[in-house]
């Protein structure tokens, strides 16, 4: 990918957060252009009182049984990304217990937030940022919540690669160089509801807790080379936990 970055600013470390160009792999085939603190949980504030949930383990309380939704962790996406981080951080047994809480699992990210906004559930695990922001702006009583176990840095949909032997390679190169510009990143962050890794892109429309902070300690990065190499093993664990619960 290095050779197709035509604009000098794109290869300049000062353009990007942490003063470096972020790659998800040592061969520089995956460029990371969005990086943000993942909000592991979202709550409906009419159903969850302040302080009721401060830890992931609080979700195991019987009172939350049938009142939790989650983005499907058995496919690539936000639910799996969160599972991958925390299964390494707090262990597999927690997830077996959480599955027994009769959580509502869906692959429809908007549906999950709709359930939360309408009060069908009280808590959502791995909420979708874009849908959260839309419901919040519409007046839904939603808040993000970071448990005391900590949070991690995520790229979400914010990475790009050039596929070998794909049609229209020149158009793909042109798009990559545009999407990484300030204009391209401003459009991306406004439409997706997540920050850009560029330091010159506005963030005033985003929840402050989502923004990367230099003095914050994050427990993992879901775009690290280690995370990329661990995906297959973690996906197997996710299926081991959730397939029987989902009737597969």
Regions found by a protein language model. Name each.
Residues 45, 72, 128-129, 192:
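Short secondary-structure boundary segments
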Residues 61-65, 87-88, 117, 121, ...:
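Sec-exported extracytoplasmic/periplasmic mature domains
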Residues 123-143:
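A ligand-binding cleft/hinge motif common to bilobed small-molecule-binding domains
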Residues 158-222:
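Mature extracytoplasmic/periplasmic domains
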Residues 1-113, 117-120, 154:
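Extracytoplasmic ligand-binding site segments that recognize negatively charged/polar headgroups
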């Amino acid at each position: 990918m290095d050779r197709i970055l035509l604009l000098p600013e794109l290869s300049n470390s000062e353009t990007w957060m942490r003063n470096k160009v972020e790659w998800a792999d040592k061969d520089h085939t995956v460029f990371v252009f969005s990086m943000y603190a993942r909000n592991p949980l979202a709550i409906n504030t009419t159903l969850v009182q302040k302080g009721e949930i401060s830890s992931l383990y609080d979700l195991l309380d019987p009172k939350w049984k049938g009142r939790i939704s989650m983005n499907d962790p058995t496919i690539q996406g936000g639910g799996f990304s969160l599972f991958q981080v925390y299964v390494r951080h707090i262990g597999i047994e927690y997830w077996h217990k959480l599955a027994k809480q009769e959580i509502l699992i869906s692959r429809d990210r908007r549906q999950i937030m709709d359930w939360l906004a309408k009060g069908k559930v009280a808590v959502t695990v791995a909420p979708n940022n874009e849908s959260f922001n839309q419901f919040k702006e519409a007046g839904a009583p939603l808040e993000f919540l970071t448990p005391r176990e900590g949070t991690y840095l995520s790229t979400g949909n914010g990475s790009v690669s050039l596929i070998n032997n794909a049609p229209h390679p020149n158009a793909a190169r042109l798009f990559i160089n545009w999407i990484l510009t300030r204009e391209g990143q401003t459009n991306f962050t406004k439409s997706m509801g997540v920050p850009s890794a560029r330091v010159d892109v506005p963030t005033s429309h985003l929840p402050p807790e989502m923004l990367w902070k230099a003095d914050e300690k994050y427990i993992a990065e879901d775009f690290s080379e280690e995370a990329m190499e661990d995906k297959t093993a973690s996906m197997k664990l996710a299926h081991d936990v959730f397939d029987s619960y989902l009737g597969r």
